A protein has these predicted regions:
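C-type cytochrome heme c attachment motif
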Residues: 59-71, 84-90, 94-95, 106-110
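Short cysteine/histidine-rich zinc-coordinating motifs and their immediately flanking basic loops
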Residues: 77-82
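Detector for the c-type heme attachment site
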Residues: 68-74, 101, 113
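Positively charged n-region of N-terminal signal peptides that target proteins for export
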Residues: 1-5
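Bacterial N-terminal signal peptides
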Residues: 7-16
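Flexible coil segments in periplasmic/lumen-exposed cytochrome c-class electron-transfer proteins
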Residues: 24-54, 62, 102-152
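Sec/Tat signal peptide C-region and signal peptidase I cleavage site
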Residues: 16-22
Length: 152
């Protein structure tokens, strides 16, 4: 776990040096259509049955992520595999003014990856069926690690 946090921290630090897409830079039509589709869905999740730690992480997610876009975007996205969320969060952290620290990024990741393993099970299973054996094992290990950490 410490190794994962250290690697995530290094990746975040390295990625922050990259130049983020300018806010006014146009988005291609396909990406714009995907975003619009995701934003049409619900903007909240019933987390009442989630573990307390995940509920706390949801609060960080909802506070930080709603500053720049609708929560319906990540909630209804087709991201489900932990690696998808890792890339997404790193990209959001690079955005100027995001205010997402490495610690917040980890909490947001934990929430989104955990939530996907519960609420997006069908999408997750479909993606894992198409993954390489190594990718599938890495995703399953990360999901197990999250459930071991939070399901008490």
């Amino acid at each position: 776990m410490r190794t994962y946090i250290a690697v995530l921290g290094l990746a975040i630090a390295a990625s922050s040096a990259l130049v983020a897409r300018a806010a006014d830079e146009p988005i291609d039509a396909e990406t714009k259509a995907r975003i619009e589709r995701f934003e049409k869905g619900p903007a909240t999740i019933d987390i009442s049955k989630y573990p307390d730690g995940i509920k706390e992480n949801y609060e960080v997610f909802s506070t930080k992520c709603s500053q720049c876009h609708k929560l319906s975007r990540p909630i209804n996205s087709d991201y489900a595999v932990p690696e998808d969320w890792s890339r997404y969060i790193k990209r959001m952290m690079r955005k100027p003014g995001s205010g997402i620290s490495a610690g917040d990024g980890k909490k947001i990741f934990d929430f989104l990856a955990y939530d996907s393993s519960v609420r997006k099970k069908k999408i997750l299973d479909e993606k894992l069926a198409k993954a390489t054996p190594e990718e599938k094992k890495a995703a399953e290990d990360k999901i197990k690690e999250l459930h071991d950490k939070y399901d008490k």
